[in-house]
């Protein structure tokens, strides 16, 4: 398809661009129309702005409008600058409202006059400079006429009139007139919305007062006042400032706390007082348990001794086991006994081992009902965590052969670290006569967990079937053992309370200490640390029989050298004690150096001595080795006694050499002592 352009618009418009010509032709026509329309609109706007004051003048000068119709055009044009000022005065909205009342009050004739006045106003723009002078004279004469007398009844219209006359007296410049025109628009638009509120100022003030009286009891103003008086930020600040004023000062002790007295402790915690407390607790607990029988499934419970300490000890985590006089196990309680297998291995059946130990207990005359559990059965059936926990919770008391106690606790896990689930060990020996005693001893035991976190421990001391006297005996035996086992001893005990292991029950005090707490934090050496210290001591004893050369080779010392080394140690310790004694007895306030500084100073001197002693010791060892080799070649026996005799003869002949050797040995011993001390530190 071929596109064809129409040539007619190009030939008609006589221009290079069709669209441009059309737009150019349209623009002048629109501008002309806009110019004429704009003039009309501007004129109408000016009329609308000046309509209100014109109407006021029309109301005042009704007879003049009727007589002189031709002069109205000129008079209105002349009054424009005088009428533009009132909109800025505060009384400007009042006259706008009065127009609405003036309209119904006037007759039909003035309304017609107003309409006639609007028509000639459209032709107002062409103004001549000559008529305004004549109009100004007329305006000056206008207030002289003051035709307010024909309408005396219209007080609402006449009262605010003088305020309007006073405002035009102050004439403003052309710049202020432009601003008043803009403000006049907004005021005149709002004026027709308030026709009914046009009232004198006195009445408006009265109404405003009445509104204020009604608004006083309302709640919103109260809230505002409260907010203005006290802001939320200020209120918080005041509250914070008042808190320290209210807080009481710490109570200062005016007396000194006495040190712990063990005799006084035993006077308070005696058998008579403990039995009274136990009897009172049993009577109180029986009532509380009856109330809680509906909620709890089991009726059995245990008595617990709660011990609170002054200072939390530094001790390893472990289960401490104590002996009791009367067993915690009741008649109907279930007790499990973990025993080793007769044949080790997961494939072997564990029924023969079970039958073997049951027969052995029956023959020995053990009266307590025990459930034998071979360790092979434990490994096969209790593999998961839930199964292990269920096994431990299904028994009231757990016994284990001493050969398996460590292995069984490691297998069952952390659930055995509770006083109720602890594995109490016993010895299953072949002697049937001692087996019942061993079982009763294992059943009369209790345990508590020792920690380095809290200051409270709970020790089970009895069950619900036990009497008050038996409970008191168990408590006294436990307190006697706590004196040795508890970290810090009895002096570190703040209080002791007796209660049962059911939550929500009461507790009775056995002992409350008012003594001064211990100065030092108690430190407990656990069984593992004791074993390590024992091994260290043995290692030091073995190393004391050897000496090290420069080439890092150990040389074994003779028996005489070891003895001499031990004597030198004792002498050295005595000298150190003698040096330290006068310093302590001086009584002066001399500053004692820190432990670290003392160690450094002593170690520096020891190192210097050690270097010289090591060289001499190595030379001696080499010389002694060479002498022994020569003697063997000559045919003498290699016994130590012969060597000692030869050495003694040589010492008699050569006193100087002997003295040197002794000095060397002493220096060697000093070096070894220093080395041992460093190792121990």
Swiss-Prot record:
Residues 1-248, 579-681 are annotated as: Disordered. Residues 611-681 have a biased composition (Acidic residues). InterPro entries: Ribosomal_L1-TF, Ribosomal_uL1-like, Ribosomal_uL1/biogenesis. The modification Phosphoserine is found at residues 15, 17, 89, 128. CDD domains: Ribosomal_L1. Residues 54-74, 599-610 have a biased composition (Basic and acidic residues). Residues 103-112, 189-217 have a biased composition (Low complexity). Keywords: Phosphoprotein. Belongs to the universal ribosomal protein uL1 family. Highly divergent. This is Ribosomal L1 domain-containing protein CG13096.
């Amino acid at each position: 398809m071929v596109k064809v352009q129409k040539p007619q618009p190009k030939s008609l418009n006589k221009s290079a661009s069709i669209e441009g010509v059309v737009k150019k032709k349209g623009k002048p026509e629109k501008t002309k129309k806009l110019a004429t329309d704009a003039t009309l609109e501007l004129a109408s706007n000016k009329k609308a702005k000046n309509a209100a004051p014109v109407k006021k003048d029309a109301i005042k000068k009704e007879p003049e409008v009727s007589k002189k119709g031709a002069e109205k055009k000129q008079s209105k044009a002349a009054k424009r600058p005088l009428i533009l000022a009132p909109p800025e005065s505060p009384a400007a909205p009042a006259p706008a409202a009065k127009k609405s009342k003036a309209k119904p009050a006037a007759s039909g004739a003035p309304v017609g006059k107003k309409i006639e006045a609007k028509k000639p106003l459209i032709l107002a723009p062409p103004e001549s400079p000559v008529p305004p002078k004549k109009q100004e004279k007329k305006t000056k004469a206008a207030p002289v006429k003051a035709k307010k007398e024909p309408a005396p009844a219209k007080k609402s219209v006449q009262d605010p009139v003088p305020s309007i006359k006073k405002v035009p007296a102050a004439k403003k410049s052309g710049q202020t007139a432009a601003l008043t025109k803009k403000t006049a628009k907004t005021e005149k638009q709002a004026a027709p919305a308030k026709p009914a509120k046009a009232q004198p100022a006195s009445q408006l003030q009265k109404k405003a007062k009445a509104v204020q009286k009604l608004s006083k009891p309302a709640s919103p103003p109260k809230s505002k006042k409260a907010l203005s008086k006290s802001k939320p930020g200020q209120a918080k600040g005041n509250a914070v400032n008042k808190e320290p004023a209210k807080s009481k000062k710490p109570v200062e002790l005016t007396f000194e706390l006495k040190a712990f007295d063990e005799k006084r402790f035993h006077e308070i915690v005696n058998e008579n007082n403990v039995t009274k407390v136990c009897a009172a607790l049993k009577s109180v607990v029986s009532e509380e348990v009856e109330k809680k029988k509906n909620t709890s499934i089991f009726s059995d419970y245990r008595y617990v001794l709660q011990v609170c300490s002054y200072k939390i000890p530094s001790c390893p985590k472990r289960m401490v086991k104590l002996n009791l006089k009367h067993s915690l196990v009741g008649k109907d309680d279930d007790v499990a006994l973990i025993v080793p297998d007769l044949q080790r291995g997961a494939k072997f059946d564990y029924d023969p081992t079970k039958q073997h130990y049951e027969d052995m207990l029956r023959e020995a005359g053990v009266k307590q009902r025990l459930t034998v559990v071979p360790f092979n059965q434990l490994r096969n059936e209790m593999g998961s965590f839930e199964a292990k926990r269920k096994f431990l919770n299904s028994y009231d008391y757990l016994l284990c052969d001493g050969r398996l106690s460590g292995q069984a606790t490691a297998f069952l896990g952390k659930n055995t670290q509770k006083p109720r689930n602890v594995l109490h060990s016993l010895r299953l020996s072949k002697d049937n006569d001692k087996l019942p005693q061993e079982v009763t001893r294992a059943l009369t035991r209790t345990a508590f967990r020792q920690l380095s976190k809290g200051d409270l421990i709970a020790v089970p001391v009895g069950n619900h079937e036990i009497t008050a006297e038996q409970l008191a005996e168990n408590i006294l035996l436990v307190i006697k053992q706590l004196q040795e086992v508890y970290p810090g001893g009895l002096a570190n005990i703040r209080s002791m309370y007796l209660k049962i292991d059911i939550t929500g029950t009461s507790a009775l005090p056995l002992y409350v200490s008012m003594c001064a707490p211990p100065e030092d934090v108690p430190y407990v050496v656990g069984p593992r640390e004791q074993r390590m210290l024992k091994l260290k001591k043995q290692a030091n004893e073995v190393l004391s029989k050897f000496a090290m050369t420069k080439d890092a080779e150990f040389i074994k010392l003779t028996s005489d050298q070891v003895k001499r080394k031990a004597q030198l140690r004792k002498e050295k310790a005595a000298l150190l004690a003698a040096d330290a004694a006068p310093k302590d007895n001086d009584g002066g306030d001399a500053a004692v150096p820190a432990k670290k500084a003392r160690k450094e100073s002593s170690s520096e001197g020891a190192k210097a001595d050690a270097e010289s002693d090591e060289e001499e010791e190595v030379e001696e060892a080499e010389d002694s080795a060479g002498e022994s080799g020569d003697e063997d070649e000559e045919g003498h026996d290699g016994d130590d006694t012969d060597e000692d005799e030869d050495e003694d003869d040589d010492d008699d002949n050569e006193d100087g050499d002997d003295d040197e050797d002794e000095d060397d040995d002493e220096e060697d011993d000093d070096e070894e002592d220093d080395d041992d001390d460093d190792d121990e530190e």
